[in-house]
Amino acid sequence: MTPVTEPPPTLRERFRGTLLGVAVGDALGTPLEFELPGSFVPITDMIGGGRFHLQPGQWTDDTSLALCLAESLIERNGFDPVDQLTRYCQGGRLGGRQPRR
């Protein structure tokens, strides 16, 4: 029997996976941001807290800015600095692009 192979991911799926990785890594690392290596117990779950007192799974402005950039690149079909800056400013006024529960 020949093994079934999955088709390679599309470019869209790869972009989506990248942004998901950014958000998950940001949410996992936020509680330890600015901490010195070895000064904390390693985490194995979404714990929240940290200097920003975020809820478990909540990301920071790093992810919000990455989402603004991705939206701008997609909707403008390339780099548009005015659109990108506008999105950054609107995101700040609207409380950023925080996860919805």
Predicted segments, located by residue:
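Structured, active/binding-site neighborhoods that engage oxygen-rich ligands
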Residues: 1-101
